[in-house]
Amino acid sequence: AIICVGYVDDRYTQDIHYKGGCLLNDNFWWGNIMLAYMCRAIDKEIKPDTWYEESIKRLEEMPLWPENWLNHQTRDEYWKHGSVSVNYDDINIPVFAIDGWADSYTNSVPTLMQGLNVPRKAWIGPWAHVFAHDGAPKPAVDFLGEATKWWDKWLRGIDNDCLEGPQSTVWLEDSMLPETVHVVSDGRWVGVDDWSQINDKVMYMTYGHLGETENINAEVVELCTLPNHGLLANEWMGAGVPG
């Protein structure tokens, strides 16, 4: 069985590298963080006799990830590695998928649910790139309890209610004033059983509200925007930062 949290099923279209073919800034900060991670020495407790030599070899052969990603700006063979969307049928065991709206990987939850043909369930909460029991912004959920039930059913053969309810449990956010940190997200939980049945609805903007019919009257709206307006925006893919 599988539990995946904050994941992608397509490394080219859903990851932090390219969106719609456009290069994302995240290539550079994440690539450099990985550079720092890979520079760390091997734990002496694990390799007491060879930790130094293996650490030096790692430094000598270490790739520069931003360079690798920039060398593959279109979908090619490079991105197939780790992209289960290439063939969802390769997965033949139950899957529990979890992510949050404040993370950057939420598109992968509905695409994975639609692509799989195995027992599956999903959560999408209001959270950033964190585990759901830490849930920021709140409300958090009992991820550890649900994970235990998932493992109990599929690894230990214990009958329980882990598949009861909708296939996907999703946090439907209400409109909120912009803040640099949202400690609590306003909204409610809803259930989705079939993502392919979700349809788009076209709404037309008019003065003060959205309407279902196009407004043919000319309107003028004057905005006085503060120069620091962008400072109030939330961070995309907040990696453990509350809100």
Roles of regions detected by a PLM:
Residues 1-90:
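Accessory cap/linker subdomain of secreted extracellular hydrolases
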Residues 17-23, 111-116, 137-143:
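Short secondary-structure boundary/capping segments
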Residues 91, 97-99:
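Short beta-strand/loop motif that positions the catalytic acidic residue
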Residues 103-110:
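Conserved alpha/beta-hydrolase "acid-adjacent" motif
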Residues 117-131:
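Catalytic histidine neighborhood in serine/cysteine hydrolases
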Residues 128-140:
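Catalytic histidine-centered segment of alpha/beta-hydrolase-like enzymes
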Residues 138-243:
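C-terminal, loop-rich substrate-recognition/catalytic regions characterized by aromatic stacking residues
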